[in-house]
Amino acid sequence: MELEEQERDILFPTDDEECQVDVSCDDEDDDSSSYSSLSQNDSAPWPRSYRQSVDILTGVTPPTISFIHRRSSQTSFTSSVASLYKRRPTSIANSFASSTSKQPLLSEKDDVLFLSSQIGLSNTDLSYGEPNFCSFPQSVLNGINVLCGISLLTMPYAVKEGGWLGLCILLSFAIITCYTGILLKRCLESSSDLRTYPDIGQAAFGFTGRLIISILLYMELYVCCVEYIIMMSDNLSRVFPNITLNIVGVSLDSPQIFAISATLIVLPTVWLKDLSLLSYLSAGGVFVSILLALCLFWVGSVDGVGFHTGGKSLDLANLPVAIGIFGFGFSGHAVLPSIYSSMKEPSKFPLVLLISFGFCVFFYIVVAICGYSMFGEAIQSQFTLNMPQQYTASKIAVWTAVVVPMTKYALALTPIVLGLEELMLPSEKMRSYGVSIFIKTILVLSTLVVALTFPFFAIMGALMGSFLAMLVDFIFPCLCYLSILKGRLSKTQIGICVFIIISGIVSGCCGTYSAIGRLVGKLD
């Protein structure tokens, strides 16, 4: 098979096109108009802002001062944005075209210019410094921070639903998702133009693949925002359980009051232009996970709640819900390409995945065993809701579960906001801070409506894990890998991918059906 067919019509640049990303400040003024016109090319694929916004969400690259000619009030955020585009040198004119779509992928400088237009920076404010990559320990911390999130709280509940043997499924999911993360790496290595998960989708299936994957990733972030509201509401209701309010004949109970209160608290953080502080705070997610696990163990061992034997070995009727929750626990593939792209030594990415997934599955299993052993069949959707409030460790855990979503909500919503602005307001003249505030406010209020309608943390997590995580973390990595590297794979590699795809389809269908059934039953 010819090279062109194997690489899905990759367009190689001519000598005249070979212009490196690292451009000096003197040359930039002369070229800014051409770069600006390229970045605003109508044929550029949506979403163009995905990589930048997700990198801001995860903080995968340590920030450096790479923007100049700007007052210090803007330095922190702009420097963070500039640091997102430090990767191996590539040609500014390189473009990728699949057999089904000839729309080019954006270069790194196009990405920077596009995002600078979103946050109100001019071309003359930009300068491109030396590459600033993540070290191996930083990459490991980023990986753990992405994977080990709010799903940690619901692992004991998943064991209650599926039984002790459900932990075998948790372990198998960790192995599978770690492997599919490596498949994404191999897809990225097939072309220097591929940077993000949507890029991989376009390489495999044209613009349709890019669009489907982008929508799924944005849906994941949206559901996370809903989960944050529910999480804050549930834990605040645990602290203040007897609060009620009657407004114009409408009676609100404690969870509803605190869902509204939590929304009002996070709303100003969404309006912020500078998200750097929130990004730094959310980067401590790994330490939060350790703190929550320690608090749970402390309450069980020191405060006297104790650990008890017993429980179901296997509950086939409720196992699909547990499958969805376990899938929810490993839904981090949306940003794994960004972690890979930011590494000083990309060859160590498989080791980063191995350590990150190993850490997460270890903590998931420990928390699941401790929580279910302590509270048994009485375990609730979040183990913090079962912890006796008279103990200091319980109070620390509950308030940690309240504060953490406040730092993460705006970061999770930002990629959705930028994607919608890009889609709904294609012209820069139509964009303004006021319009952005309006879109953000509507999105925040919509998450409140969903949280009030479906205030079931574990079931929403199970639905997300069954439907979205199975597609994003199981099925699409294998499909993209088979498509991009078609003709160069062994029968064993193909067989493994087919097995994972079938497993994802079966798990996704069973889990989604069960989760929807639970939601309907709760609403009746």
UniProtKB/Swiss-Prot annotation:
The superkingdom of the source organism is: Eukaryota
Name any one Pfam family assigned in the record: Aa_trans
- Per UniProt, which keywords does this protein have? Amino-acid transport, Membrane, Transmembrane, Transmembrane helix, Transport
Which cysteines are disulphide-bonded? none
Q: Where is the composition biased (Low complexity)?
A: 33-43
Q: Does the keyword Transport apply?
A: yes
Question: Alphabetically, which GO biological process terms does the record hold?
Answer: amino acid transport
Q: What is this entry's stated membrane topology? A: Multi-pass membrane protein
For whether the record's keyword set contains Transmembrane helix, the answer is: yes
Q: Where in the cell is it found?
A: Membrane
Which GO CC terms are listed, alphabetically? organelle membrane
**Entries under InterPro entries matching the protein:** AA_transpt_TM
Please note every region of biased composition (Acidic residues).
14-32
TM ranges are 139-159, 164-184, 211-231, 247-267, 280-300, 319-339, 349-369, 398-418, 442-462, 465-485, 496-516
Which region ranges are annotated with the description Disordered? 1-47
Q: Which PANTHER family match?
A: AMINO ACID TRANSPORTER, TRANSMEMBRANE AMINO ACID TRANSPORTER FAMILY PROTEIN
Q: Which family does it belong to?
A: Belongs to the amino acid/polyamine transporter 2 family. Amino acid/auxin permease (AAAP) (TC 2.A.18.5) subfamily.
Q: Under what name is this protein listed?
A: Amino acid transporter AVT1G
Q: Origin organism of this chain?
A: Arabidopsis thaliana
Q: Which gene encodes it?
A: AVT1G
